[in-house]
Amino acid sequence: MGAMCYMVEIHVVNTKEDLRAALDLRVEVFVDEQKIPVCDEVDHLDNIGAILDGKVIHVVAISNLQIVGTARIIFDVPEDEYPHIGRVAVKRIMRDNQIGRSIMNKLHQILKEKGCQGATLSAQLEVKDFYIKLGYVQRGKTYMDVGILHQDMDYIF
């Protein structure tokens, strides 16, 4: 059976309610599904203060008034590094519906509008090909993070 087509809108998070819903989805995907400890999943950038300070932008994908995907861009990085995309998550029943691609396109649009030259991310090995299809290039060797193999990847605009 082919993937269904869903109307999805990607919004920048600017309320505590949307941030809470994004974090709930991340816990569902990373903690419940992948068994990552919650203390490794939620960090100091997951609050409205970090958003207001410009350290991070969170986005949510909304379909039928439900948050079905989320991700964030970290701008609080060393001066010689690109902003870091992370915590890309899509609700299990909504995968294979281009939602991840829509989220990444929105993140790239945000970065371009801010004058950034590229982005970096740490991909779980099992979804590395998703990022390669978007134009990301592998950097360095694979490594373990929270018990899962990862690969650093870069995207140049």
Region annotations inferred by a language model:
Residues V60-I62, D152-I156:
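Short, well-ordered beta-strand micro-motif
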Residues V90, D96-Q109:
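Conserved acetyl-CoA-binding loop-helix of GNAT-fold acetyltransferases
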Residues S122, I132, V137-D152:
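Conserved catalytic-core motifs of GNAT/GCN5-like acyltransferases
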Residues M104, L111-Q124:
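Conserved GNAT acetyl-CoA-binding A-motif
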Residues G2-G49, D53, H58, I62-Q66:
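Short amphipathic alpha-helix that is part of the acyltransferase structural core
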Residues F75-I85, R95, V146-H150:
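A conserved beta-turn-beta hairpin within the catalytic core of GNAT-like acetyltransferases
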Residues V60, L65-F75, Y82-H84, A89:
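Conserved beta-strand in the GNAT
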